[in-house]
Every structure is written in C-alpha cells, then in structure tokens.
Amino acid sequence: VTTSIDWAKSSDSMVLLDLPSSLTSIANQRDHYLRQSVSMNMLVNNFLISIAREGFQSLNPFINNGFIKKPELNLEYQQYGPSVTYFARANYSNFDINKNHYLLLDNKTAKQIGKRFFTEIGAETLQDFRYFDLSINGSFLYKKYDLDDIKINSKSTTIPSVEIKISSLFSQSSEDSFSLFMPEFVYQKTTYKDQSADPIFDLHQRNFGNFNRLNTKYFFGKDRVPDTEFLLARLKLQKRINNSSRLNFQIIKKNELQESRVINSMLNQSIEKDSQIGTNVSFESEILRAYFAANYSQKRNTLNFGQTGIEIQLPETRLILSRKFQTNVPLLNSKNKLDYVEFSLERSMSEGYKFIGGISKDLDSKKNLESYFGFGFENCCLAFKIYASDKRLSKYNLLNFHSLQFNNASWDKMISIENKSRINFEFELKGLTGGNNNKRNRFFEPLMK
C-alpha cells in the first residue's frame, strides 16, 4: 500500500502570477494551478486499486478552479497469457464545483455536477513471425453520467476501438558503429459516437500544436473520445558512432481515412481529413546537439509544426539557438500560429559564478516575448541567481472563453500590470533538496529550456 499527498494552497490567488513559465507553453502561460490531492494505491496480484481526492487552486482570479474529484476510484486488472493479454479498467469519479469567489458562474454551468462511470475492456495479441511482429489491440469503452440536475438525461455510450500494428527490427554493427532500423505500419479506428450531450469535467487538450498531428491521444480526461481512422507508416533509424555520437532519424506518413466528427463538433466547424508527412532528425556528440523536426499537411499545403536548433556545450560556455513554429494551437483556437526564435547563453566564471542571459522574439509580430540577463552562483550546498527579466504575456485561452468574455477589461488591466520589467532573486539550499554534483546545472535548467 502506498500513500501520496500533493497539497499546496495560497491565501492570495494572485501571489504566483509572476512565476516564469516555459516559452514552449506560451499559449497557456496564463494558467497557474496549485495541485491539491491525496491518494492511496494498493497492488494485489494482477489488481491495482486506487482512491483519491483531487482538486486544484487557480492562481488566476479569472480562471475557474475547475471541479473537485471527491472521491475518484480506479480499478485495473491485467492478465498475461502466452499470446493474448486481457485488460480491464474502471473509473468512478464524483465531481463537485471548486468555487472561485472572484469568478461568477451562471446557474446552468453551476448545475453541471455529478458522477461519471468509465470502463474499458479489451485484449491484445502479439504474434512473432520470422521477419516481423503483428500486434492487434481491441477494446470497448463504456461511459455513463449521473448528473445532479434531474432535468438533464445522459445516455450511456459504448465506443469500440481497434489497432493493428506490424513492426520489425533490424540491426547492423561494425567496429566503430551500431545501427538499428525499425519500420512500423499502423491501422487504427475508433467508432464515432455522439457525445455532445455529455458534460465536460476534466477534459483538457494535449498541446501537440494541432489536432491532426501524428498522434492518437488528443485529450487528457475521459469526457470526449474522438473518432479516428487512419493508416500510418513510420521508419526509425538510430545509429551510435564511436560511443560518443548518436544520430536519430524518423520519418512518418499518415493518411486519415475520415474526418473526426467529435473534434469538429467541439470546434463548431469542419476540419476535413488530411494526409501528412513528418520527420525528426537529431545529432548528439560531446559538445554539439542539433535537431530538426517538421510536420507538413499535404492536402492543406501547410506546415503544421517545425522546429530546429543547435546547442553547443564548451568547457565554460553553453550556447543555445532555436527556431520554433506551429499552427492550429488548440489552446488558442483552430486557426493561428506561433513563430518565434530563442537564444540563450550561460557562461561559467571563477569560483562557481555564472552569467546567464537569453531572449525569445515573436517573428510574426516583431516583438520580444521574454528576455533576461543576470548572474548566478552555485556550489555544493547553496545556489542562487539574481537577474532582470521582461516578459509579454498572452491572455487567450479557448478553454476559458467565458472568463475572457465577461472579464475582458479586468484581463487587460492585469496584463498591463504584469507586462513590466522586474528584478528576480532566487536561492536554493541544496543540502535540503538532495543536490549533488550530478545535479549541478539543474538550478539553471528552467531558464535554458
């Protein structure tokens, strides 16, 4: 039996709005939450049982705290066989409103509370042939809502899904190198079921850059299961050279066989099925790391996602330069783009001191998104840094459209207050946090990413 407590609470909902956030999350950097959860887990043979209470405190007074799960019960069972594996999962959650006294909710929204029951039953078979492996995974998803508002009737929903995968692995070795080739073919289909009448409790979009990238999991949460049908071919190459350098190459081709009616219903518009090609290339050595990744829509003739960068690690200097581009960011809306370049520098000086600096610039609006420079110090027991920073925040968030609509003037005022230069001081007592020589650079990682 294991117990986990992850609980934080602030007396002032605006106290942590100045926390720095990753530039790659710029579309959602308005959101800061404190997790408040207690859970207990028990593993007995092939059964896993867990019970939890989970909630969040929003550190933005105009964004809802969301719902509290009190409780959430999970049951999982898995039975392994010689060629077939059976699995079953069940989840029961009782949702209540975690009220934010700054934000007014209409009565209709306030009544959308109740219970959700979700189960998944399926099996997977794996056959090992001479030159390839065949995997077939089939499952049925069942969900049912019991809402406190008796005027709202929610039907139970059963959603079948199947995935067929053919994969192989080839290797080649020589005196100074070792290579792996991994081809893979995938067919996946999830049947469409109308879920528009179901409430949304803990649904959150995965920020992969757009809804139709080379992934199958579109959402966190269980309130919407997108219908999908596609064919995917993937080729991976991994090569190690002289035990000091690594080369990774991947190319993916994906053809969607139908559009997703569930996602189109959520966006209230029609996004047609697509045909895409993507690639990912990276090279790493002792002093150099370079990478390139892109995803291109052939039918729309649009670059959905792209990033390239180089990182140079010298004995006393670390230099990073990158360019990132993506369109159709789900956290903003269905049609938009982010295009920015990042530069950062870390220079070690004598006796543990360091100079740190960096800038991120939006190439579309020709404006600086974030910049910083300063000094830091780190030894075996203490680390601190003092630096000046300037950041321009974004207020747009599709998931909280109503909070923008009814508090637009307050949002603009808050943005104007936060979008100013500041002096930051941070310190860490490494003896209390388990620091050691292997974690020497961890203190500076958030600024360098």
Language model feature labels by segment:
Residues 1-68, 72:
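Flexible loop and strand-edge segments within Gram-negative outer membrane beta-barrel domains
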Residues 73-449:
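Outer-membrane beta-barrel translocator/pore domains, especially the C-terminal barrels
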